[in-house]
């Protein structure tokens, strides 16, 4: 019977949260949380921004491509790279405005994660060639394993933490409201021991 009541209560609280609790988290709250807790927000894996191309070894203009990917921030280079990728590449990922983990990257190129991490410490452009393809990785930004997470990467995690905190507070407030209303309407009476 207690188990059933707790299931009903949980279902009621879940519906209350979905219907009445605000889901948006203000930027200022995220920034404040980040500033206060950034030492606890540590990367468990290296993350990068940049671009990756997988190109057949016989593709034309490979040397020109290698020069263009060194400056992916230039709009004309990105346009040229995208046209090239559309025509010749077997794989193309542009992630200059989003973070990818090194484990996301090694799925796309023949390289061990530890080896990639070691290479990333020393260089921003990595080129690997096998019998069929050339793999070109250009890194525009990176944070190594053990570094503090950048706020752009930690944002979703922080929002989830803040929403969980808000949920706990919201449920407590709703319980208090129900408790006070029950006392006011006489549905709940308090007796004091003498």
Spans of model-derived segments:
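Peptidyl-prolyl cis-trans isomerase
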Residues: 1-194
């Amino acid at each position: 019977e207690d188990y059933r009541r707790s299931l009903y209560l949980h279902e009621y609280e879940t519906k209350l949260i979905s219907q009445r609790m605000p889901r948006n988290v203000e930027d200022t709250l995220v920034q404040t949380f980040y500033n206060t807790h950034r030492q606890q927000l540590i990367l468990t894996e290296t993350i990068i921004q940049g671009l990756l191309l997988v190109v057949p070894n016989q593709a034309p203009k490979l040397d020109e491509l290698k020069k263009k990917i060194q400056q992916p921030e230039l709009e004309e280079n990105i346009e040229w790279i995208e046209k090239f990728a559309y025509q010749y590449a077997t794989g193309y990922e542009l992630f200059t405005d989003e973070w990818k983990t090194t484990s996301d990257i090694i799925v796309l190129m023949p390289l061990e994660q530890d080896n990639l991490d070691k290479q990333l410490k020393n260089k921003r452009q990595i080129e690997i060639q096998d019998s069929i393809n050339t793999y070109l990785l250009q890194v525009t930004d990176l944070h190594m394993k053990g570094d503090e997470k950048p706020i752009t990467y930690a944002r979703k995690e922080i929002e989830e933490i803040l929403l969980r905190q808000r949920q706990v507070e919201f449920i407590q407030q709703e319980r208090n409201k129900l408790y006070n209303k029950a006392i006011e309407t006489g549905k709940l009476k308090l007796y004091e021991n003498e």
